[in-house]
Each structure stands twice: as structure tokens, then as C-alpha cells.
Swiss-Prot record:
Similarity comment: Belongs to the class-II aminoacyl-tRNA synthetase family.
Lineage: Archaea, Methanobacteriati, Methanobacteriota, Thermococci, Thermococcales
Coiled-coil annotated spans: none
Principal subcellular localisation of the protein: cytoplasm
EC number: 6.1.1.22
Keywords noted in UniProt: Aminoacyl-tRNA synthetase, ATP-binding, Cytoplasm, Ligase, Nucleotide-binding, Protein biosynthesis
Cellular compartment(s): Cytoplasm
Name this polypeptide is given: Asparagine--tRNA ligase
Molecular function terms from GO: asparagine-tRNA ligase activity; ATP binding; nucleic acid binding
InterPro entries: Aa-tRNA-synt_II, aa-tRNA-synth_II, aa-tRNA-synth_II/BPL/LPL, Asn-tRNA-ligase, Asp/Asn-tRNA-synth_IIb, NA-bd_OB-fold, NA-bd_OB_tRNA
Family annotation (Pfam families): tRNA-synt_2 (PF00152), tRNA_anti-codon (PF01336)
Length: 431
């Protein structure tokens, strides 16, 4: 019986071995009495050569087959340093599962067209590489979280109130009332810490923002952590240790995929080792002003400001101590400066900016009610959340990591939309 193998398993050491391959025709060319097919599967590619002199029937089938046709091939491995993988297969049998006459994606296809046919674009090896890196980053996150004693929980997606501001909520009819798509699992994770202490979740989050920047999606994957008994400095240490492990482990396991995008430019990834640099918001404003950026103390930093700031660093770094009025209601006021909150963002270098937003949470009932009122919201809409401050409240902190933003930085992508399977933006809901 002939062993079925993956394309990447065909190596020079298998010289003379009979193999069976199943995959899709990635490239094809004809030279004289030979047809060269580059076969693709989830593992990679391998070249298969069909010779008229060796097997005329298989050669005729190979001549018929089109790009992206699905096929099963049998043949014998032959070492060849000219082949893409150092070995090729001498084709002896080709079974066409489905022949494709014309594949719509061409080399010069525009980005918008590729997004229109995203269901077909996903089969590209470069797109598959992104998804492998993304999956490995989460595999690494799970490894670290498990060994550090965190519990995974599964919060709801349908919610009744806002976490990050009511203007960015997606509203939907829920029987005889209205519900919203979750902006963040944070409030539910805060409830879970009273039984589990250190919790995390990975869920889709939804933001009805009409932002058209390279780092915004209306639906993204959100890795969120929340822990009892931790202050801001404790949670920043968790953030840098987690991100460092995710990046270094992925470098170890997905070097080939990362090099497709970064070539040998991996210095900033290797630099992602704790402790990450830390600067205050005040220092960040001073740096920006010294570089000619028109920004005043108290203003929020957008993508442009963050891009300039990242030029100062060759690794991820923290900005902490933000003004209270530009941050969310649940963040704890700085006891040493009531103008500020105990919050910190982690920014990625090379212009990528914020990948994590975190803070110590307000654990005092009266102060939290006051902040809710200051934001023009109703305390009764947050009754259950306020209950957490009435029954054994403790100091606690947490953060959220935008997975697509992390992937975009790791692979130097020009937009986060390439880091998700089917991107959702203000102008795109298909396919």
C-alpha cells in the first residue's frame, strides 16, 4: 500500500519511495514532453513532474488539469536540488477530483478584489501562513495561561449595556426588548474573579466605529484577562510576560511563515523580552511635542501620534497614567493625581501602536457610581456590575489584547483586515 504524505514531508531522504499526495494545483508549466505541477496542501508545496515517456496516460491528465484543480497523485520521490523543496515526485498516476478551467484570482489582482473573493483568497499559501501564525500565537497564549494558573471562561456575546461607550454599540431586537453585541467581556470577567481569581477569555468583540484606519475592524478577536488582588503594575507584568511568550514561541514554531513577510527582519520580535520599556503619558506628550506633533496634555493619542512615538522604541513598550477624561468609566482614579487613572496601554514598535489596553479597575462603589454619572450613563443600567463593589470588593486589574493587531505587527501587515479570516469593516460584510 502506498503511504499518503503531505507535500512538506517529501524530502531528499525519501529518494525512491512511492508516495500518494492529495491537494490542489498551485502552479503548472509545460516544457517539451513534460508537465511540471507544483502541488499545494496545508503543509506547503512540492513539484511533481509528469513525463510522456514515463507514463503517457498520467501525462495526458496533467496536460488537462487547470490551476486550483483538486487532484490525487501517485509517484516516486526523486532528490533534485533544483526543486523548490530539494526533492520532487516523478508522477505515475493523476486522478482529477475536480478540474478547474479558470481560477479568477490572478497575480495582479487588487486588494479590493481579493477581499471580494476572500473565500477563494484563503487558499493562498501566504494567507494560510497568516492563519497559522495567528493560531500559533493563541496556542502559545493558552500554554502560558495554563502554566501560570489562569482559568478560561466563556462570557456572553449578547449584552445589555456598554463597556466602551454607547455610540459604538451594535443594537439588535431581542424578543420584546433590545440587546447589543458585546464590545468587551471585561465586566463579566470581573464577576468571575470572585470565584476563580485569575480568568481569561477569547471572544469576538464588536465596535460600531466608522473608523477606516489600518488597525480597525468592526469585529475582532479579543483576548481578555482579569485578576483579583492585582494592581496596575502587577497586571503590566502579566501583559509583558504573556506577549513575550506568545511572540517567542511563535518565532520558534512558525519561523518559515514569519519569514514570508519579514524576511530576516525579526529584530523587534526578538526584542520582545521583559521588562518592556515604560513611559508616562506626560513623557509621551513631551516626546511628541519635541518631534513637532501638535498635541496638548489631556488629548488622546491617535494612530498618527502613536506611530511617531513608536519610532523611539525597538520593542513593545507601555504608556501609563492617562488623563481620566479620555479613558473608560471603570478605571481607578490615581490616588496621587485625581486628573489621571491607573491605566496603561502596550504599544507595538514599527508604527503599529496600541495592541493592549489595560487598567486597575475602580473597586469603590461610590466612586464607580460617580464615574458612571459623570459619563452621562444610568447606574441602574449597571446594577449587577455595581453589586460586585458591595459584596467583598477587592483590588483588581485586567486588560484586553486585540489579536489581529498583534498578528499585524508580528507579520508586518499593512492592515489588520489581512489578519482575520473574513474581515468586517464599515464597508464590508461579504463574504
Amino acid at each position: 500500500m502506498i503511504d499518503k504524505v503531505y507535500c512538506a514531508d517529501v524530502t531528499p531522504e525519501m529518494e525512491g519511495k512511492k508516495v500518494k499526495l492529495a491537494g490542489w494545483v498551485y502552479r503548472k508549466r509545460e516544457v517539451g514532453k513534460k508537465v511540471f505541477i507544483v502541488l499545494r496542501d496545508s503543509s506547503g508545496i512540492v513539484q511533481v513532474v509528469f513525463s510522456k515517456d514515463l507514463n503517457e496516460e498520467a501525462y495526458r491528465e496533467a496536460k488537462k488539469v487547470g490551476i486550483e484543480s483538486s487532484v490525487i497523485i501517485e509517484g516516486t520521490v526523486k532528490a533534485d536540488p533544483r526543486a523548490p523543496t530539494g526533492a520532487e515526485v516523478q508522477g505515475e498516476k493523476l486522478q482529477i477530483i475536480q478540474n478547474v478551467d479558470f481560477f479568477p484570482i490572478t497575480k495582479d489582482a487588487s486588494d479590493e478584489f481579493l477581499l471580494d473573493v476572500r473565500h477563494l483568497h484563503l487558499r493562498s499559501p501566504k494567507v494560510a501562513a497568516i492563519m497559522k501564525v495567528k493560531g500559533t500565537l493563541m496556542q502559545a497564549a493558552r500554554e502560558w495561561l495554563l502554566q501560570d494558573g489562569w482559568y478560561e471562561v466563556f462570557p456572553p456575546i449578547l449584552v445589555t449595556g456598554a463597556v466602551e461607550g454607547g455610540a459604538t454599540l451594535f443594537k439588535l431586537k431581542y424578543f420584546d426588548r433590545y440587546a447589543y453585541l458585546s464590545q468587551s467581556a471585561q465586566l463579566y470577567l470581573e464577576a468571575a474573579i470572585f470565584g476563580l481569581e485569575k480568568v481569561w477569555s477569547l471572544t469576538p468583540s464588536f465596535r460600531a466605529e466608522k473608523s477606516r484606519t489600518r488597525r480597525h475592524l468592526t469585529e475582532f478577536w479579543h483576548l481578555e484577562l482579569e485578576a483579583a488582588w492585582m494592581d496596575l503594575w502587577d497586571i503590566m507584568k502579566v501583559e509583558e510576560e504573556l506577549v513575550s511568550y506568545m511572540v517567542q514561541r511563535t518565532l520558534e514554531l512558525r519561523k518559515k511563515e514569519i519569514e514570508l513577510y519579514r524576511k530576516d527582519d525579526i529584530k523587534t520580535l526578538k526584542n520582545a523580552v521583559p521588562p518592556f520599556p515604560r513611559i508616562s503619558y506626560d513623557e509621551a506628550i513631551d516626546i511628541l511635542q519635541s518631534k513637532g506633533v501638535n498635541i496638548e496634555w489631556g488629548e488622546d493619542m491617535g494612530a498618527d501620534e502613536e506611530r511617531v512615538l513608536t519610532e523611539e522604541f525597538e520593542s513593545p513598550f507601555f504608556v501609563y497614567g492617562y488623563p481620566k477624561h479620555i479613558k473608560a468609566f471603570y478605571m481607578k482614579e490615581d490616588p496621587e493625581d485625581p486628573r489621571k487613572v491607573l491605566a496603561a496601554d502596550m504599544l507595538a514598535p514599527e508604527g503599529y501602536g496600541e495592541i493592549i489596553g489595560g487598567s486597575q479597575r475602580e473597586d469603590d462603589y461610590d466612586k464607580l457610581v460617580q464615574r458612571i454619572l459623570e459619563e452621562g450613563m444610568k447606574p441602574e443600567d449597571y446594577e449587577w456590575y455595581l453589586d460586585l463593589r458591595k459584596y467583598g470588593s477587592v483590588p483588581h486589574s485586567g486588560f484586553g489584547l486585540g489579536l489581529e493587531r498583534l498578528v499585524a505587527w508580528v507579520l508586518k501587515l499593512d492592515h489588520v483586515r489581512w489578519a482575520t479570516l473574513f474581515p468586517r469593516t464599515p464597508s464590508r460584510l461579504y463574504p
